[in-house]
Amino acid sequence: MDIAHDLQVIAAQEHTLVFPQFDADRAWQVGAYLHEVAKARGIPVAIDVRTFGQPLFFSLLDGATPDNIDWVRRKSNTVAHFRRSSYAIGLKLQQAGGTLADKHALAASEYASHGGAFPLTVAHAGVIGSITVSGLPQRADHELVVEALCAHLGHDYSKLALAKA
């Protein structure tokens, strides 16, 4: 895995996957789409769509655990703090040889720099929340969210996907 290349691709994902507008109905549509994809693939994940401070969609598929709920919370907190995907933050820390605790004084009990939380960005408003998945390896969590966003925003996922690890 080439961290520098992945960071470039993630930056392109974050720049491209922007909603023209966003409301509770759109949150439900994106969350329900993620739920159906996960269910069809038989993957046990927790799914969370939220604006900062307000949950709009949550689902826990069969096989997901309370631990996944906590991962969702901590990954979402990371997006709220940095306004970047949790996977990008984790890769940047890996590249720098650090942790959220030693580089940013952020407690691991409240923040997670593992993939799966993606900034919910609205044109002319910026990052207003996050879309988070937990239950797969971090790269797969991240890519599941990107795949769903591409489907909803009319982008070709193959052009924004990370290279296979």
UniProtKB/Swiss-Prot annotation:
InterPro entries reported for this sequence: PduO/GlcC-like, PduO/GlcC-like_sf, YBR137W-like
A Pfam match: HbpS-like
PANTHER family, alphabetized: PTHR28255, UPF0303 PROTEIN YBR137W (PTHR28255:SF1)
Family: Belongs to the UPF0303 family.
Designated name of the protein: UPF0303 protein Bphyt_1734
